[in-house]
Amino acid sequence: MKKFNTEEKIILAIDGLDIFQAKVLLERCPNIKWVKVGLELFTREGPSVIKILKNLNKKIFLDLKFHDIPNTMSAACYEVSKLGVDIISVHASAGSKALTASKKASLEGAKIATVNAPCVIGITVLTSLSSEEFQTDLDRKNSIEENVIRLAKLSFDAGLDGCVCSPLEAKILRSMYKNNFELITPGIRTNIQKKDDQNRIMTPFEAISNGSSKLVIGRAITKAKDPNKAFLDICESIC
């Protein structure tokens, strides 16, 4: 696999940083192509953070996980699509009507703003949830894997471009959907013993081998003594 392709597979999560810290980090790591902006950073900095990152020539996964009624979700997708982001996330559990409306609105918003339309991906089951929490806290009778499969199918049938799943479910989903259906996976750890706030985890190599399209990685890079080396080492590990 070419190095360029491996760099395209890593999305750096910068939510724990302010925009100044993020800029310094990205200047130290010129090979990073993708960044993830989540609720924490977007709430702190506002939409201006997108413009700043785009000026640094970064591709942006805006991970706000919209989950509401169809009209509200589609309106939100319309607005963020005008920012020129590359990927946006919505909760698949919002239902097929909301998903279809969100995808349509993202196309309309991008067209109005004359920017490329973003990929819209469905959140399946959060990787922070363990099997026990999923069944007790959420009162679910089926397994996490069964629910991920169901929500991935809902996303696919609604015309979304992919889904977010843990690396544990990536293998079975990749057997069901071709490579043009994105499987974006958090829960990636270079040190498999260090879970932090995730439960369903794998190493970068294991996740890519299972069929993940892109890996969301934060602390392993942002908290490394040498973030650029940490990023390049991860790229090398998935060759």
Swiss-Prot record:
Catalytic activity of the protein: orotidine 5'-phosphate + H(+) = UMP + CO2
GO cellular component, one term: cytosol
Gene3D superfamilies: Aldolase class I
Gene Ontology terms for molecular function: orotidine-5'-phosphate decarboxylase activity
UniProt subunit comment: Homodimer.
Entry EC no(s): 4.1.1.23
Family: Belongs to the OMP decarboxylase family. Type 1 subfamily.
Role: Catalyzes the decarboxylation of orotidine 5'-monophosphate (OMP) to uridine 5'-monophosphate (UMP).
HAMAP family attached to this UniProt entry: OMPdecase_type1_B
Residues bound to substrate: 15, 36, 63-72, 127, 189, 198, 218-219
Assigned keywords, A-Z: Decarboxylase, Lyase, Pyrimidine biosynthesis
Signal peptide: none
GO biological process: 'de novo' pyrimidine nucleobase biosynthetic process; 'de novo' UMP biosynthetic process
PROSITE patterns associated with the record: OMPDECASE
Catalytic residues, chain numbering: 65
Pathway: Pyrimidine metabolism; UMP biosynthesis via de novo pathway; UMP from orotate: step 2/2
InterPro entries: Aldolase_TIM, OMPdecase, OMPdecase_AS, OMPdecase_bac, OMPdeCOase_dom, RibuloseP-bd_barrel
Protein name per UniProt: Orotidine 5'-phosphate decarboxylase
